[in-house]
Amino acid sequence: MGSGLVARIRGSYGTKLTLALVVVVVLSVGVGTFVYQQTTTQLETDVRADLTGSADARADHLDAWLSNARGQTQLASRHPVLASGNDTAITRYLEGLAASDERPDGVVAAHVYNTSTTTIEASSADAFTGVNPREQGAPFATDPPSFATTSDVVVAAPFTVPAADFPVLSVLSPIPGTTDKALIYMVNVNTLTDDFGQNVAGSTTTVVSADGTYVSHPDQDRVLTGHDGPSRLLNQSRTQPAYIDANGTVTAAAPVDGAPWSVLVRAPHDRAFALGDFVASSLVGLVLITIVSLSLIGVTVGSTTVTALRQFSRRADEMAAGDLDTDIDTSRNDEFGTLAESFRSMRDSLSESLTDAERATARAEDAREDAEQQRADAEAAREDAEAARKDAQETARALESAAADYEEALTAVADGDLTRRVDASRDHDAMARIGHALNDMLDDIETSVAAATAFSDHVSDAAQRVEADAGDAIDAGTDVSTAVDEISDGATEQTDRLHEVAGEVDDLSASAEEVAETVASLADTAGQAASAVDDGRQATEDAVETMDDVADDAEAAADAMDALDSEMADIGEIVDVIADIADQTNMLALNASIEAARTGADGDGFAVVADEVKTLAEESRDAAEDIESRLLALQGQVSDVADEMRATSDTVSDGRATVGDAATALDDVVSFVADTDTAAGEIRAATDRQAHAASRVASAVDEVAGISQETAAQATAVADSAATQTDTLSSVDDAAADLADRAAALDDLLAEFDAHDDTEPEDY
């Protein structure tokens, strides 16, 4: 089945083109899939690196902010005014801190906090003065930090206050010179992440504390609420960067060194890998464009090419079916136009060949109408024409096949292997046209050589049959000559016997004259006469039978001569066909020489083959003309012998009639003798009548003797004619042997060429 599929693919250009397009599409899809996988892998690495790097950078940013906030808070807490106890000066100083450009980012207020009473004694914002943070749930008040030295700084957990609509965190530093007071920077938590942009579209940055609550979130309502992400990610991010891709979200986390916080950067998976989707869609678009482009190429170029090839194939099938009037015109001026021109040239050549075949068929039909006995020959001619048409169809179908390499094939052809073909499926247009032309020409030469080989075999067989028939005819002529010699001897013997009868009749006449003298011897004489008459009658009957045999033999010999003449006519028809084939082969060789001259140096080997074929064709034609002249002479001699044999048969028939008359006369003599024996009383009168009858018998016997002599002479002439016929048949036998030798020589010459023998001898 695999070989059949391969053969089907190799036998259809459309299938090849479709398969090629499918292979290209599959390769495009494969390459696109590979590129997509590579892009996806690289994109995943890049997204992971980007998000992780962003989380690290923002954690570093927060750590830097915390360090700055700690330093600024510690530095501000060391100002002497804070320990002076002057509330006005302290308030003015706090207001200056809150409005200073050097304050940490996000600071919205500065307070002096009494750790003992947990109240804000002074503030840059009047709303916070006197407020008890513990009552508001401030972590630094509910869980007051401890300061080992005045250099300690504490960052408290975020919380909310009624006076602000945003969550705040506090940075506390003890005020030197006091025992229970600390400077607090109140910071808007939202400002901690305001500077963080979106390195991935749709991404968000949050800060989560160690207890799992949001320190900062784009949604203010989520601040100070529990973290809803994977706890594994949060636990890992406390000590090292972490990354996770789950639930349609990619998250990268990094720890903040200056606080128990983790910075989380989140992005929707589809947004983070939007580039991958874009690449995928681009690849799909590219593949679709490739498929559409290839489809358009297949529909435009491929379909037109396949359509043109199918049209040419259909035209070739029509030509192979015998329709040489099919339209091969095309408006294309490319390779298909050249191919159409080659098809037209081939059609014209085939038309001429078929015209010749039709003419041969017409001649055969005319011959059939002239004589029914030639119907077989006409049928053979029609079969020859049909074979020629089939050969032409095979030549047309042979255009669809391909063979071996040009140089190797032409070398093999030059060496005599006419079965080789060139591979005409070449990209080079001229070589493709030359390949088609060479294949056509090689098909014609191979068909002609195969036909000539088959014809040579048939001529050899026919010559052998003629030689055998001539030998049989020689044997028949020898038999005829022997029979005629026997007839001549019989006729001579018959003449002698008739002379004896004449003597007996003379004796009978003398006895009749002596009857009057003695009646006693009448019975003896009558008995002798009856015996002699019986012998004569028996001799005449033998002569009649012998003449019948001679007539039959002569008629058989004449029929044999007619049959031989018919065989000579058949051989003449064969010789005519040989001459026609020789002329056609000569014309084919001339066309091959012209084609070889047109192809230049590439056709030198082919020109040698064409010249050799032309020489063989001329020798075949000369041999056919020689055989035809010999057959005409032999046919004339055979006709003459047949005419002579019929004349001999007619002469023998006449002699038979004469001998029949003699037999009748002898019967009368027997009657007379009987009358003499029964009528003794009328002996004298009967004796007179007997004398008269004896005289007539003597005359009849003389005539029979003359006829016998003439029969002997005719038999001698027939024997001479038979000898002449034997000599003529010997000449026929020699001519047939010579014809067989020439056919064998032609067969030896044709044997130098290897060709497929697809022609049966009876086709000729």
UniProtKB/Swiss-Prot annotation:
It is a multi-pass membrane protein. Methylated by CheR. It comes from the Archaea. PROSITE patterns: CHEMOTAXIS_TRANSDUC_2 (PS50111), HAMP (PS50885). The keyword Transmembrane applies. InterPro entries: HAMP_dom, MCPsignal_dom. Residues 38-278 are extracellular. The keyword Repeat applies. One of its GO terms (biological process) is chemotaxis. CDD domains: HAMP, MCP_signal, PDC2_HK_sensor. Keywords: Cell membrane, Chemotaxis, Chromophore, Membrane, Methylation, Photoreceptor protein, Receptor, Repeat, Sensory transduction, Transducer, Transmembrane, Transmembrane helix. GO terms for molecular function: photoreceptor activity. Residues 347-401 are annotated as: Disordered. Its main location: membrane. Residues 2-16, 299-764 are cytoplasmic. Pfam families: HAMP (PF00672), MCPsignal (PF00015). The chain crosses the membrane at residues 17-37, 279-298. One of its GO terms (cellular component) is plasma membrane. Residues 469-705 form the Methyl-accepting transducer domain. It is found in: Cell membrane. Residues 303-355, 397-450 form the HAMP domain. Residues 347-394 have a biased composition (Basic and acidic residues). Belongs to the methyl-accepting chemotaxis (MCP) protein family. Transduces signals from the phototaxis receptor sensory rhodopsin II (SR-II) to the flagellar motor. Responds to light changes through the variation of the level of methylation. Also acts as a chemotransducer. This is Sensory rhodopsin II transducer. It comes from Halobacterium salinarum (strain ATCC 700922 / JCM 11081 / NRC-1) (Halobacterium halobium).
